[in-house]
Amino acid sequence: MRKYTVNVSGNAEFGRSQKNKSETEIFENIDQLDWYAYDDNFGTSEEKYLVRAIRELMNDLQEKWSDIYLLRNDKAVKIYSFDEGRAFEPDFILLANDKKVGNTSWQIFIEPKGSQFLDSNNTFKNSKEGWKEKFLLQITERDEARTLLDDERYRIVGLPFFNNEMSREVVNSNLKDL
């Protein structure tokens, strides 16, 4: 049985164009974002806030990376948790090449997550989606320890869930520190 949430305020973002000011409260001039791989974003509010957050960070990211692209993963990439082998399709993949370390490519998994998935402690840790965030963080741990891929030319990273109100600053900080 599926559960549906009805937004009585009428401000649900899913299905609305992010580049159309009359349709969205989270407008971005998508046509000017050469790093965003699509013509528009019809995603959830958290997905739109992620695009905005990346835009605001782009100057910092371009100082260390080139060829930066944010891709919406729509069933193209499926990854499997280390603990139980559960399938997971992160909503976004940020790809980049390192300017300072020569021929190093970055692949960063990002999952925007709405507040409806928070647990009773206002975190995602013990929510039904918590295993996904744990897995994303395990990817980063294994990348840093070089147990995921023993090759300095490739970096595979998972970020904590992105939520505009709860974790935006943590995700921003993690991206800056990579």
What are these regions (language model features)?
Residues M1-L178:
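Intrinsically disordered, low-complexity, repeat-rich regions
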